[in-house]
Amino acid sequence: GTLLTAITEGLSAFESFTPLAVGIAWTLVGALLAGYLLLYRRGFPPFIPIGSADIRSFMRSADGLLISALVVMSCVIGLIAVIAPPTNEDSMSYHMARVRHWIQQQSVAHYPTHITRQLFSNPWAEFTIAHLFLLTGTDRLANCVQWFSMVGSLAAVSLIASRLGADKRGEVLAAVVAGTIPMGILQASSTQNDYTAAFWLACFCYVLLRIRDAPEVEGPPWAWISCLGLSVGLAIL
């Protein structure tokens, strides 16, 4: 999220927010990450095989049924997000409208408009949509920003429950309760940004609990402190 914001603002400063520039930027990011993994990683964690008997046993349990229902629901919402283009009023009036303006002027700078929320509303979700639009040449993936935020939020909620002392069933129930919020289901296949903000706030809460739980053993390392600040900053953005 921070890299995406930096790329967006950096390219916009030179009015170079174009498909070519964004593509080059993400290619460089991918190359740097691949180089880091090759040079500094000692090795990846060993793969732990899961037997078919274990899977069948889990699927027959109450937790397995709840997780299965949540996965099916998420897949259906994801399919709708990909198939159905953005059509709701918010998408047309400012979410997608500001994205098209930014792409047209090759910058996220302010522009003349009588719909002022295109200028002052939190822009991070639309930054992401703009990147997807520039990289693919279509708005087909615009709704996926909310959908991926929903999936990430459910994972974060489960981890938060674990940090608060819940057992495996408690983690599953936390994810199910969060995933079945009616408004969340409706918005997860749109370009609205509620789930995007919720995801970064959930990340902030998890990191905060992570630092709280192990201050003496590990100390709050700079990486976790940085994640704490960045997550709340991205939630506001």
Report residues per predicted region.
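Transmembrane-helix motifs of polytopic, lipid-linked glycan transferases
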Residues: 2, 30-39, 141-165, 203
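Extracytoplasmic catalytic/substrate-binding loops of multi-pass membrane glycan-assembly enzymes
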Residues: 84-98, 104-128, 136-140
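Transmembrane-helix signature of polytopic, membrane-embedded enzymes
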Residues: 140-141, 157-182, 198-199, 218-219
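Short helix- or helix-capping micro-motifs
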Residues: 174-179, 206, 232, 236
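Membrane-interface alpha helices of multi-pass inner-membrane proteins
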Residues: 222-237
